[in-house]
UniProtKB/Swiss-Prot annotation:
Domain BPL/LPL catalytic: from-to ranges: 81-270
Residues under site feature: Lowers pKa of active site Cys: K188
Taxon lineage: Eukaryota, Viridiplantae, Streptophyta, Embryophyta, Tracheophyta
Organism expressing this protein natively: Arabidopsis thaliana
Pathway the protein contributes to: Protein modification; protein lipoylation via endogenous pathway; protein N(6)-(lipoyl)lysine from octanoyl-[acyl-carrier-protein]: step 1/2
Location of the transit peptide in the chain: 1-34
Swiss-Prot/TrEMBL catalytic activity: octanoyl-[ACP] + L-lysyl-[protein] = N(6)-octanoyl-L-lysyl-[protein] + holo-[ACP] + H(+)
Name the UniProt record assigns to this protein: Octanoyltransferase LIP2p2, chloroplastic
Pfam families referenced in this protein's UniProt entry, alphabetically: LplA-B_cat
EC annotation from Swiss-Prot or TrEMBL: 2.3.1.181
Subcellular location(s) of the protein: Plastid, Chloroplast
Length: 280
């Protein structure tokens, strides 16, 4: 049994690259770090967290990581063995992704002469953009240990982002009837696109933090016309009491809040893992 649900995401070529390879090497030798929120229940399930939020990881590599983790977990399940949940959080270099049934009619360019790489993936939904300044979360979790309900899972992912925007940035975001994702007015702040196989999830959500939204002009994001995309930085700068924060500060704040709220919403104990484990 395999399900796919429409996805979409968000971008920012403005992100500086000066926090990349040195941090990547540090992650490879870092020790496991536990993140646990006091509001979680007494014995929460463990979730291994591959935290690469300050790095630009090529889409193809992250996609391969997800499928590798997914296959490992499915093999354990087939043997009736327990497996922990997993989460990858990162940024991507500029890239467009499409779902299995995506239409090229939503591309405002010739796919043979695309401005960035274009990947067609297993997820549902239409074309979207990922890029620097957008935090992407890929949960690979066993819904048998949570709730075997795709709508429940989607609403929980939305809840994570709504909480982050409210608690970290005082932004009042909400759901929009008939659409998946998180919105402020008619601006989509976060896109959600998942695939579920044997009740194991992959793909996930993307939150525009300091994202340069220009590349969205080259597509019809998620196939939704007459609605725009937004970013945390853009909304903060438009606010009445704007206090200038550097892009890296905004990303740090959003990252910390995403992990905290994900831990609370899904009642998981986050345990940071080294990148080396992904590449073994």
């Amino acid at each position: 049994m395999v399900f796919s649900v429409a996805t979409s995401s968000v971008t920012n070529p403005k992100l500086h690259h000066h926090h990349h390879l040195s941090d990547f090497n540090r992650n490879r030798v870092s020790t496991s770090l536990k993140i646990m929120n006091s509001k979680n229940h007494t014995n929460p399930r463990k979730c291994e967290c591959f935290d690469l939020y300050d790095q630009l990881i090529p889409y193809k590599k992250a996609w391969s990581w997800q499928k590798s983790i997914l296959n490992e977990k499915k093999a354990l399940i087939d043997k009736n063995q327990e497996c922990s949940d997993s989460l990858i959080i990162l940024q991507h270099p500029s890239v467009y992704t499409m779902g299995t049934g995506s239409s090229e009619n939503y591309l405002n360019f010739d796919i043979k002469n695309a401005p960035f790489d274009v990947y067609r993936t297993e997820r549902g939904g239409e074309v979207t953009y990922h890029g620097p300044g957008q935090l992407v979360m890929y949960p690979i979790i066993n819904l048998r240990n949570h709730k075997m309900d795709l709508h429940w899972y989607l609403r929980k992912l939305e809840e994570v982002v709504i909480r982050v925007l409210s608690s970290a940035f005082a932004i009042n975001a909400s759901r929009l009837d008939g659409f998946t994702g998180v919105w402020v007015g008619n601006k989509k702040m976060a896109a959600i696109g998942i695939r579920v196989s044997k009740w194991m999830t992959y793909h996930g959500l993307a939150l525009n933090v300091t994202t340069d939204l220009t590349p969205f002009n080259s597509i019809v994001p998620c196939g939704i016309r007459n609605r725009g995309v937004g970013s945390v930085k853009g909304l903060i700068e438009d606010g009445e009491h704007y206090n200038k924060l550097e892009d890296l500060q905004l990303l740090d704040i959003a990252h910390e809040s995403l992990l905290k709220e994900f831990s609370e919403v899904f009642q998981l104990q986050m345990e940071k893992q080294t990148v080396f484990k992904l590449e073994c």
